[in-house]
């Protein structure tokens, strides 16, 4: 643990602030997987042979494609070609219909969404070369995040101010950057076994006599095992898991623990949330105060937090919430916590490597991002 933290001392002295607004303006998509043949052919045809760079269809893929082609190939798309022209431009690029397109104009047609068949229809009247970028875009860019981040760039630029420590700010900056560029995450990354617990152990002296832990999204119980390995002790652990198959494995794993540990664990097979059939955390029959709530429930974190607002108000536990399932998690999760307990929590952001971290050197951009809310 100490070694891991020491490794990232280099990040604490780099800069005091990270300009997210400039990041949105200047980030360029990096080419990771566009074949060299396609790339060189596109550049040659458009610069040397007079082929007109265009994209078929005014779609979300085309929106990303405009930037992809500009950033990766330094080519500006001349036209967006559509079946029927109902508007003049699409994100700054002129829109024309197939019938408006001059016959025999040589086209370099970029495809981003398996629309090769539609593009071939244009070939009936125009000589063209199709550059299929579908796979390259899919491998480079997580589209929902990319578009949401750009559509809400000002909100994300402002949001960095909720973090006071340098590692959190750098993590936030590099995490967003990885989605805008299609590059690997290059910020601080900690071993996954410390997820939820490194920050908790550091701040638990500010919690009121650590007693109960709500482990929401227990899966197979690996988090519980790690807590025991680093000697965290709770009076009670509420292991909550919605997947019935996971519950079977979880139950078997808990049975392997010593009786003194297993008797403290209550397994609950329910989905947490606000719907009538869901479990509201406020309805738990708690035997002792709660000092830690962690959540990793595939995008249901906001509803689960709202279902626990009385627990949070009453016990002010440390919250460790996964914030990587939805594009808006880094906005909505801290806002929800602040709405439940105004001015009571400070926020810390940490990134962890996944279980395959050794193969990828612990660098991942789409998972294991945890937002901590720590009582001030």
Predicted regions and their residues:
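Short amphipathic alpha-helix with an adjacent loop that forms part of the alpha/beta core around
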Residues: 96-105, 201-206, 278-287, 310
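S-adenosyl-L-methionine
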Residues: 1-54, 58-73, 86-88, 102-233, 243-287, ...
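Active-site segment flanking the S-adenosylmethionine/decSAM binding pocket
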Residues: 210-223, 268-334
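C-terminal substrate-binding/active-site "lid" region of AdoMet-derived donor-dependent transferases
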Residues: 134, 318-358
């Amino acid at each position: 643990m100490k070694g891991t933290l020491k490794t990232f001392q280099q990040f604490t002295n780099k800069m005091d602030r990270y300009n997210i607004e400039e990041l949105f303006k200047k980030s360029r998509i990096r080419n990771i997987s566009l074949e060299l043949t396609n790339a060189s052919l596109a550049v040659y045809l458009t610069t040397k042979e007079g082929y007109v760079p265009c994209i078929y269809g005014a779609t979300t893929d085309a929106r990303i494609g405009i930037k992809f082609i500009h950033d990766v190939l330094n080519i500006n798309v001349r036209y967006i070609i559509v079946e029927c022209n109902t508007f003049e431009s699409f994100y700054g690029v002129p829109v024309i219909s197939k019938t408006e397109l001059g016959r025999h104009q040589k086209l370099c047609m970029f495809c981003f969404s398996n629309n090769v068949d539609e593009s071939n229809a244009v070939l009936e009247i125009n000589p063209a070369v199709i550059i299929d970028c579908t796979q390259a875009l899919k491998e480079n860019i997580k589209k929902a995040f990319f578009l949401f981040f750009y559509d809400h760039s000002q909100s994300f630029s402002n949001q960095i101010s909720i973090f006071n420590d340098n590692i959190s700010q750098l993590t936030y900056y590099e995490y967003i950057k990885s989605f805008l560029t299609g590059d690997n995450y290059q910020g601080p990354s900690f071993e996954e076994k410390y997820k939820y617990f490194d920050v908790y152990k550091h701040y638990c002296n500010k919690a009121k006599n650590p007693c109960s832990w709500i482990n929401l999204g227990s899966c197979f119980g690996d988090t519980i095992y790690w807590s025991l390995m680093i000697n965290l002790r709770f009076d009670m652990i509420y292991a909550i898991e919605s997947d019935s198959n996971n519950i079977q494995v979880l139950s078997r794993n808990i049975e392997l623990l010593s009786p003194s540990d297993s008797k403290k664990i209550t397994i609950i097979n329910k989905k947490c949330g606000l719907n009538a059939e869901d479990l509201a955390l406020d309805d738990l029959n708690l035997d002792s105060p709660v000092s830690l709530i962690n959540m990793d429930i595939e995008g249901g974190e906001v509803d689960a937090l709202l279902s626990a607002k009385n627990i949070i108000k009453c016990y002010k536990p440390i919250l460790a919430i996964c914030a990587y399932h939805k594009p808006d998690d880094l906005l909505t999760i801290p806002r929800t916590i602040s709405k439940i307990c105004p001015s009571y929590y400070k926020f810390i952001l940490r990134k962890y490597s996944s279980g395959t971290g050794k193969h990828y050197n612990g660098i991942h951009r789409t998972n294991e991002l945890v937002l901590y809310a720590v009582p001030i």
